[in-house]
């Protein structure tokens, strides 16, 4: 789905579900990580997370659009547009929009390598995330050389 298709979809949902036009811009924001979308109060634009569309499909995207359009229309009408406001919760139920979006599958990072250094004299061990120059650093207890194990 590209920008024009997304804009047309948001405008269509706004007319069909809310009976009011959407006169601003809706677009995919690649910087969004944990949220499905957001409504910008200053510009009245709606930003959506493309990863939700790719992972869960168009149904989930439509649900997120409905949620953000609830924020949009209530804010423009001067009513309570925040999650905690009664107007917002009632409109969510009326249009069948979810209160929260489904969580994305996390990309787990590979565990970082832990470097273990052992003192050649007293045997004290040092565990570090970063590699150190063993020619420059010595044991803090006995001042002997360190060895990477």
From Swiss-Prot:
Record keywords: Metal-binding included? yes
Q: What is this protein called?
A: Protein SprT-like
SMART domains annotated for this entry?
Answer: SprT (SM00731)
Which organism is this protein's natural source?
Answer: Geobacillus kaustophilus (strain HTA426)
Where does the protein end up?
Answer: Cytoplasm
**Tell me, what is an example of a GO biological process annotation in this record?**
response to stress
Alphabetized InterPro entries for the sequence: SprT-like_domain, SprT_Zn_ribbon, Uncharacterised_SprT-like
Residues annotated for Zn(2+) binding in this entry = 67, 71
Which family does the similarity line name?
Belongs to the SprT family.
Annotated signal peptide: none
What's a Pfam family in this record? Zn_ribbon_SprT
GO function terms (MF aspect): zinc ion binding
What cofactor(s) does the depicted protein rely on? Zn(2+)
Q: Which residues form the SprT-like domain?
A: 6-147
The upper taxonomy is: Bacteria, Bacillati, Bacillota, Bacilli, Bacillales
Per UniProt, the keywords (alphabetical) are: Cytoplasm, Metal-binding, Zinc
Active site annotation, chain numbering: 68
Entry GO CC: cytoplasm
Q: How is the cofactor bound?
A: Binds 1 zinc ion.
The intrachain disulfides are none
Kindly indicate whether the keyword Disulfide bond belongs to this entry. no
């Amino acid at each position: 789905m590209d920008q024009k298709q997304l804009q047309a979809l948001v405008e269509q949902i706004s007319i069909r579900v809310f009976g009011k036009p959407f006169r601003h811009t809706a677009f995919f924001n690649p910087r969004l990580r944990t949220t499905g979308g957001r409504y910008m109060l200053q510009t009245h634009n709606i930003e959506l997370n493309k990863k939700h569309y790719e992972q869960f499909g168009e149904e989930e995207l439509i649900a997120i659009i409905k949620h953000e359009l609830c924020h949009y229309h209530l804010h423009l009408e001067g009513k309570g547009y925040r999650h905690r406001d009664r107007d917002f919760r009632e409109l969510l139920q009326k249009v069948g929009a979810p209160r929260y979006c489904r969580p994305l599958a996390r990309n787990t990072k590979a565990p970082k390598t832990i470097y273990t250094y052992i003192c050649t004299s007293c045997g004290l061990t040092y565990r570090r995330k970063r590699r150190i120059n063993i020619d420059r650093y010595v044991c803090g207890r006995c001042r002997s050389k360190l060895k990477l194990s």
